[in-house]
């Protein structure tokens, strides 16, 4: 994570589970060299369990972006409406959590989804040829191509049902055997 003051640190994104409820924490936590800051002023709705994540820094806008690929989430959009499922299902959602230059968080969802209920416990590996700032942060300022393979999603859990755990049907989950290439494609303006 690169913070607006150019400090490198970590960010714990929203995640499961709360001590007194079988539900995810909705807020991220900033980890700095000398302290940590729970960001209870913001709710991250679209990704709640360890999933594949790619990180980007845009020096032009001074924004940090994290893209989450699938996984498990209490919330998803159903017919354009943010909807809660307390069973915290597997989702196909690809979402972006951004920190603006003034330190505020924003969350958005991509129109493209994962091809299946996958991504939970998966890992994103940067392509070694992609420019980075270190710490696995892709340097958007150094990318000039209209499209570029930026890395791979490896492993994780695949499910054929959104809520297999709520009905004790874990037989429909398995280790993900597909390796996904991830491409960054410049949007037309």
Where are these regions (language model features)?
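TerminUS-proximal long segments
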Residues: 133-189
């Amino acid at each position: 994570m690169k913070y607006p003051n150019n400090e490198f640190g970590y960010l714990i994104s929203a995640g499961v589970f709360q001590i007194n409820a079988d539900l995810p924490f909705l807020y991220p936590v900033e980890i700095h060299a000398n302290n940590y800051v729970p960001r209870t002023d913001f709710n991250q709705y679209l990704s709640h369990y360890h999933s594949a994540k790619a990180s980007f820094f845009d020096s032009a806008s001074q924004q940090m972006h994290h893209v989450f690929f699938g996984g498990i989430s209490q919330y998803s959009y159903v017919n354009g409406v943010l909807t809660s499922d307390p069973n915290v299902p597997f989702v196909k959602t690809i979402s972006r959590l951004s920190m603006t230059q003034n330190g505020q968080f924003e969350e958005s969802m991509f129109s493209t989804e994962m091809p299946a209920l996958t991504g939970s416990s998966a890992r994103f590996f940067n392509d070694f040829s992609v420019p980075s700032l270190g710490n696995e942060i892709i340097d958007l300022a150094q990318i000039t191509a209209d499209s570029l393979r930026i890395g791979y999603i490896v492993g994780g859990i695949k499910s054929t049902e959104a809520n297999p755990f709520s009905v004790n049907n874990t037989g429909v989950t398995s280790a993900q055997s597909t390796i996904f290439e991830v491409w960054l494609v410049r949007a037309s303006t």
